[in-house]
């Protein structure tokens, strides 16, 4: 079992829109206090979950963030914290490794890494209203159906117990030039390279 303290605190703790300026010292103190109290409660109640800090997002894109080093400091120095959680919503496939590399190499994190969110949402969002086009007519849909309409439809089918095939789903996205090829394979290799302990992802 895992408990993560925080959810993309670069956003929660930001003092302005650049996501860099924040009360890092106050947040560091909060996380340390939270981790220590959680540990006391664990011992009192016989709980066995592991405590992680995080979940850091866009680490490689926010080199001046005051929140990132605060969180990393807690991970590196508080013995009650097992590791760090990363959320990796990369825009381009070559960004898949960036956050992991910086956390390990620049910040010297040697404890466990987990990734409780990774997705291609930032690559997909600009295209959700794109039409299915020729692919749609070939697969029993209309050419004018939008990607978001297709996704809603197949979600309904899946909930009804009649999901579309993996081959169909994959072929749609491979028909678009913007789709980052080998997206999940690339992430899988990155997770292995950086010895990621636990991973959960989503499509968007």
Regions from the language model: what does each represent?
Residues 1-82, 90-102, 106:
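Active-site cleft segment of glycoside hydrolase catalytic domains centered on the general acid/base Glu
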Residues 2-5, 50-53, 83-86, 112-117, ...:
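Structural recognition of the beta-strand scaffold that forms the well-ordered cores
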Residues 81-144, 173:
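Substrate-binding surface in catalytic domains of secreted glycosidases
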Residues 45-46, 108, 140, 161:
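Short, flexible coil/linker elements and helix-boundary hinge sites characteristic
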Residues 118-124, 129-204:
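Substrate-binding cleft of secreted/luminal carbohydrate-active enzymes
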Residues 4, 59, 68-75, 81-82, ...:
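Extended aliphatic helical segments
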């Amino acid at each position: 079992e895992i408990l993560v303290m925080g959810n993309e605190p670069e956003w929660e703790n930001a003092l302005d829109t650049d996501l860099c300026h924040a009360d890092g010292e106050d947040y560091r103190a909060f996380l340390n206090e939270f981790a220590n109290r959680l540990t006391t409660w664990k011992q009192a109640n016989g709980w066995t979950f592991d405590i992680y800090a995080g979940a850091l997002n866009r680490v490689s894109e926010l080199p001046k963030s005051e929140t990132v080093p605060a969180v990393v400091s807690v991970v590196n120095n508080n013995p009650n914290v097992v590791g760090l959680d990363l959320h990796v919503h990369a825009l381009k496939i070559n960004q898949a490794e960036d956050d992991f590399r910086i956390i390990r190499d620049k910040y010297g994190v040697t404890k466990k890494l987990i990734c409780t969110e990774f997705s291609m949402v930032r690559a997909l969002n600009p295209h959700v209203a794109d039409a299915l086009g020729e692919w749609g007519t070939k697969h029993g849909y209309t050419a004018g159906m939008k990607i978001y309409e297709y996704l809603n439809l197949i979600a309904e089918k899946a909930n009804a117990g009649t999901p579309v095939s993996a081959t169909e789903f994959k072929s749609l996205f491979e028909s678009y030039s913007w789709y980052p090829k080998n997206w999940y394979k690339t992430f899988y290799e990155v997770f292995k390279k950086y010895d990621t302990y636990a991973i959960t992802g989503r499509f968007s």
